[in-house]
Amino acid sequence: SRLVKEEGDAEVMGALTFTLSDVHDDRFYADFAGKLAASPHVDLLYLKDAGALMSPDRVRTLAPAVKAAIGDKPLEIHAHCTIGYGPVSSLAAADLGFISAVHVGIGPLGEGSSLPEAERMVANLREAGHDVPIDDKLLSELSDYWWRLARAEGLPPGTPQPFDASFLRHQIARGVMTPTKRQLDELKMGDLFPA
């Protein structure tokens, strides 16, 4: 982060990558966040839930612990949708009142194993009473652009995911699940996949 700052006027964001284990409790993350925040080279931090394992209940304990450790530095949320938690965990984080940004995916780039879809997330935040000062017309235009591109390229859009509790046990990201299943099928060992 020091080198980035020496090279120019870039913002440096520290990632707190979330997982479930006996070691990774709120105190673990708060201690690590405090160390990152103590650096003058780190401008802000975010809770990165790439595995989509952070429940709304966990956000309600984890985010305040981290925020207490980082003081005035901004804290953002980056919650993937793979098992259905992304939108509700992001909303729970915003409801705490100190989250400075909710990371989203625009149009077809949202949902699935990605981040909450931008227009739906904005609507949900507003429905919950949050002020979201963005240009709705511009957001709609951006979404339309990505939808047109996805259709033209034949790319599948992200779709809302149902809750799947098995991910809380095996913690294998969906981006790993698909090729793993294919490889097991190719080896005639597909029956091992649900294990």
Language-model segments: what does each one mean?
Residues 1-195:
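Catalytic cores and adjacent flexible loops of soluble metabolic enzymes
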